[in-house]
UniProtKB/Swiss-Prot annotation:
It comes from Rickettsia prowazekii (strain Madrid E). GO terms for molecular function: DNA binding. Belongs to the UPF0335 family. InterPro entries: GapR-like, GapR-like_DNA-bd. Transmembrane segments: none annotated. This is UPF0335 protein RP113.
């Protein structure tokens, strides 16, 4: 591979990464704005974030986690 081709490829990769990083930043701001809007309407943002995290779990993992949490709460009388 010639130095020119390598340079062009590297520049393309860097350019793509920069563009995606900018998009990621824009999306993060949109998510933040949505959470702020939800909070202004009385929703609990912490609970919403917990729900989003739980939704990413496999159904079996979620069931295991729920069972363990219930066991610990019962054990501690919570």
């Amino acid at each position: 591979m010639s130095a020119v081709v390598v340079k062009e490829q590297l520049e393309q990769y860097i350019s793509k990464i920069e563009r995606l990083e900018e998009e990621k930043s824009d999306l993060a701001q949109e998510v933040k704005d949505i959470f702020q809007d939800a909070a202004s309407h009385g929703f609990d943002v912490k609970a919403m974030k917990a729900i989003l995290k739980l939704k990413k779990l496999d159904k079996n993992k979620l069931a295991e986690q729920d069972a363990m949490l219930e066991l610990y709460r019962d054990t501690l009388g919570i």
